[in-house]
Curated annotation (Swiss-Prot):
<feature type="site" description="Important for catalytic activity">
    <location>
        <position position="217"/>
    </location>
</feature>
<comment type="similarity">
    <text>Belongs to the PNP/UDP phosphorylase family.</text>
</comment>
<keyword id="KW-0808">Transferase</keyword>
<feature type="active site" description="Proton donor">
    <location>
        <position position="204"/>
    </location>
</feature>
<dbReference type="Pfam" id="PF01048">
    <property type="entry name" value="PNP_UDP_1"/>
</dbReference>
<dbReference type="InterPro" id="IPR035994">
    <property type="entry name" value="Nucleoside_phosphorylase_sf"/>
</dbReference>
<feature type="binding site" description="in other chain">
    <location>
        <begin position="203"/>
        <end position="204"/>
    </location>
    <ligand>
        <name>a purine D-ribonucleoside</name>
    </ligand>
</feature>
<feature type="binding site" description="in other chain">
    <location>
        <position position="24"/>
    </location>
    <ligand>
        <name>phosphate</name>
    </ligand>
</feature>
<feature type="binding site">
    <location>
        <position position="4"/>
    </location>
    <ligand>
        <name>a purine D-ribonucleoside</name>
    </ligand>
</feature>
<feature type="binding site" description="in other chain">
    <location>
        <position position="20"/>
    </location>
    <ligand>
        <name>phosphate</name>
    </ligand>
</feature>
<comment type="function">
    <text>Catalyzes the reversible phosphorolytic breakdown of the N-glycosidic bond in the beta-(deoxy)ribonucleoside molecules, with the formation of the corresponding free purine bases and pentose-1-phosphate.</text>
</comment>
<dbReference type="InterPro" id="IPR004402">
    <property type="entry name" value="DeoD-type"/>
</dbReference>
<dbReference type="GO" id="GO:0004731">
    <property type="term" value="F:purine-nucleoside phosphorylase activity"/>
</dbReference>
<dbReference type="GO" id="GO:0005829">
    <property type="term" value="C:cytosol"/>
</dbReference>
<dbReference type="GO" id="GO:0006152">
    <property type="term" value="P:purine nucleoside catabolic process"/>
</dbReference>
<protein>
    <recommendedName>
        <fullName>Purine nucleoside phosphorylase DeoD-type</fullName>
        <ecNumber>2.4.2.1</ecNumber>
    </recommendedName>
</protein>
<dbReference type="InterPro" id="IPR000845">
    <property type="entry name" value="Nucleoside_phosphorylase_d"/>
</dbReference>
Length: 234
């Protein structure tokens, strides 16, 4: 038990799927897991453990931003024995060829946050997904007929960023889209020696101004959720 997770040391599976929204964690537990049990609820950051196709899997929200992602990830790894974290969430597209509701496998992530540099003596280390998880997710997507794009993303510290040059710069560098957490997860995973992957769905387009409806988001997010669950299986 920690100040932010009121679970017992063995309550979490070694693999945790982490959406930003704790209510999405609840939805996944109730929709996809069998024998799911709520294991933490501090500050309503809900976490559950259950079974998917006979394998023990946990799901827990991580909140918004790198600081929140790293806080919960650090505690899961160091106090609850978690060995693998798969983030799922939304992404704002920054390339014309990336379309609404596309599923993105984030192979690496840049950031304007100082968080990763602080944990690496001021150096800007590369932050990338675990290749075995990335390859497995890509293979599973092809098997399930889910169209995915693989590439780099960018994790911004500010949702309402006043820098008008950011999106054009990301477009020039071929970055597929922008979120707020992936770089923090990958940096933490490298430092702690665990496996990590982010599977994201394009919910809005930074170049065209398009946005998904709630119904469209639910359908496309289900593809992402199911792909994450399949990737989590041993």
């Amino acid at each position: 038990m920690t100040a932010h997770i009121n679970a017992q040391p063995t309550d979490f599976a070694e693999t945790v799927i982490m959406p930003g929204d704790p209510l999405r964690a609840k939805y996944i537990a109730e929709t996809y897991l069998t024998d799911a049990v709520e294991v933490t609820n501090v500050r309503n950051m809900l976490g559950y453990t259950g079974y998917y196709q006979g394998q023990r899997i946990s799901v827990m929200g991580h909140g918004m931003g790198i600081s929140s992602m790293v806080l919960y990830g650090h505690e899961l790894i160091n106090f609850f024995g978690v060995k693998r974290i798969i983030r799922i969430g939304s992404l704002g597209a920054t390339q014309q060829h990336v379309e609404m509701r596309d599923v993105i496998l984030a192979q690496a992530a840049g950031t304007d946050s100082p968080t990763n540099a602080k944990r690496s003596s001021g150096y800007h280390m590369a932050t990338s997904a675990t290749f075995s998880l990335l390859h497995k997710a890509y293979t599973k997507a092809n098997e399930k007929g889910i169209s995915v794009k693989v590439g780099n993303v960018f994790s911004g510290d500010l949702y309402y960023d006043p820098d008008e040059d950011m999106i054009p710069a990301l477009e020039r560098f071929g970055v597929l889209g922008i979120d707020m957490e992936v770089a923090g997860l990958y940096g933490l995973a490298h430092q702690q020696g665990i496996e990590s992957l982010a599977i994201l769905t394009v919910s809005d387009h930074c170049l065209t101004g398009e946005e998904t409806t709630a119904q469209e988001r639910q359908l496309s997010f289900n593809n992402m959720i199911e792909l994450a669950l399949e990737t989590a299986l041993n």
